[in-house]
Amino acid sequence: MKRGSQGEAGSPQTEEPEPLFSEEDRSLRDGNALDESDSEESQYSGLEDSGTDRSDDEEDHWSEEEENPGKSPKEIIKVPNRSSKSPADSAADEEDRPNEIKEYENDSSDEEDIRNTVGNIPMEWYKDLPHIGYDLDGRKIFKPLRSKDQLEEFLDKMENPDYWRTIHDKKTGQDIKLTDEQVDLVERLQKGQFGDINYDPYQPAIDFFTHETMIHPVTNRPADKRSFIPSLIEKEKVSKLVHAIKMGWIQPRKPREDTATYYDLWAKEDPNSILGRHKMHVPAPKLPLPGHEQSYNPPPEYLMSEEERLSWEQQDPEDRKLPFLPQRFNCLRAVPGYARFIHERFERCLDLYLCPRQRKMRVNVDPEDLIPKLPKPRDLQPFPTIQSLIYKGHKDLVRCISVSPSGQWLVSGSDDCSVRFWEVSTGRCMKSVVLEGAVKSISWNPNPGLVLVAACVDRSVVLINPGLGDRLLCSATDQHISGYQPPEEEVQQPVTWEEVEGAQYSNGLRLCIKHQKEVKQVTFHARGDYFAVVLPDNGNSQVLIHQLSRRRSQNPFRKNKGQVQKVLFHPTRPFFFVATQRYVRVYNLLKQELTKKLLTNCKWVSSIAVHPAGDNLICGSYDSKLAWFDMDLSTKPYKVLRHHKKALRAVSFHKSYPLFASGSDDGSVIVCHGMVYNDLLQNPLIVPVKVLRGHAIHRDLGVLDVTFHPTQPWVFSSGADATIRLFT
């Protein structure tokens, strides 16, 4: 049935749609199709005969009679057979029907394009042929002529406003101009939208299957007959399988034998195995790329002069920087053959199979992981941050300072031949003692029961009672010194002990220990009865230890290895530290033996300080390094700090806080947090927390000495600018 008849039968009450063809066109089209199918002249129509042609024609006639109930079949237009007419008759018929609608002017949107009768076949078949297929009569459908060259295509692209909406149809071979609706459809598809603009993808969903049990089913379709009748096809398949099993054509699968498999752990290590050869294979290094000197026209600086050429010829082949002489040619055609080509290939072959190769493992490490995660300085307070007081009074370099055990008094020695005593809290100079020479080192006795200060002046060590503080302590100190009873038998000593009398005694001087050479340093033992001095000499008596109560002196070493710079007593154990230019030796005074030898990795040691616990030591040097030693860990530095820009003059530990400081010739004092844990498995924590500046640089000298307050987190520093500064 035709679509029109179906529409009339399905909806008789709706308005009849306007037909695409008139009745005459319909009969004309049917007649043409009928005549063409019955034509005897067409040798090949491209369609197979089917038994439905006649029935279709009869249905068409019945539909025409239904559409034209008032007309008889004789009134229906009959189109004569075109194949039986001559070309002249067909032309005359076309002139007689000027108003007749032509067949190619209208086409259905639902059917295939009637202008192309070749069918939906790949157009690549006729890619190299002049035609695109055959029509219903078997005649070739030639491609339309496309004589446009590139210039015409470009002009058409520039001048034709509809060029952008014109496409080429491969099936018909014609250019088609897209309508606005088609362009809108293409744009919507490119954007990923639906082609139909009226389509709503978000329509409300209707849930057919819910939790509520309905009375009527959703679908009441009856079951198929094949659903309850045994399948004959399956019966035949089963019978074939049974027959094959009986004949022995189908055998059951044999179970696999489970054999024990063992994994070879050393397969990759064996160089004879495939895995081992693959693992041990190292590709050969590539040849270096040629440089400018190997060019046929190198720059002038790569060409050798006559003197350089003679020198190159006189050298041995292994000493030459280049194995050839760079030359210049006008063009590449003038370059002769390379004479060393075979020799270089031979050397390359020797390198490939004679030189061993080594694989270097490249470790990808994040640079952030190499930086230690240190706590923030504000979490490590208290520590000195600002300059609070300036002690002025000296007229020359203040080389040394020391604090009393109570922390109330400060003593300083200067090159102006004076020793001054200061009150820490007010900055007032309480007393000044003028000596015979410049004061190189000074130390306050750590025993809180004595008020005694030792100062190094030229070749003497002077013991001074400043008379400050408690008068009972001052008188007890004088009684301790004057209560000495000389031995019955005099013992030969390397020094001379002399008591001071007269004006010097009233000025505070009590004892004077005269040495044979200039004294550089003095330091007290933790109990205050022993003190050691350093004589800067290459002899055997560089270090002397004095006992105050018995007024005895002794040389603990028969021979000194190197020039001694500093000495220190261990705070709790009978150990004695001796620092030479490059090493720090630790001696046991009871056993009289060398315990350890610390390697400082410095060029010249300037100062040392021992942690109050006694297991760690810091060492400053003139090459701007500060080395921290963990003596329980190693004889090498645990950490080396290079924070200062110039030589370090002094280092010091705090007695109760985890702080240490260093003074340098750059005029700065750097305070660091140095926490030592009781757990031996945990390394010390070292964090620089503050850089203190204030001293002026004078004669290329900055900070000369540094010491901490015994109870407060304060630090004192003396400098070449003749001042002492307190940082709190």
Curated annotation (Swiss-Prot):
GO MF term (any one): ribonucleoprotein complex binding
Pfam families: BOP1NT, WD40
Domain of life: Eukaryota
PROSITE patterns in the cross-refs: WD_REPEATS_1, WD_REPEATS_2, WD_REPEATS_REGION
WD repeats: 393-432, 434-474, 514-556, 559-597, 600-639, 643-682, 698-728
Location(s), subcellular: Nucleus, Nucleolus; Nucleus, Nucleoplasm
GO biological process: maturation of 5.8S rRNA from tricistronic rRNA transcript (SSU-rRNA, 5.8S rRNA, LSU-rRNA); maturation of LSU-rRNA from tricistronic rRNA transcript (SSU-rRNA, 5.8S rRNA, LSU-rRNA); regulation of cell cycle
HAMAP family with a match to the protein in the record: BOP1
Protein's name in the database: Ribosome biogenesis protein bop1-A
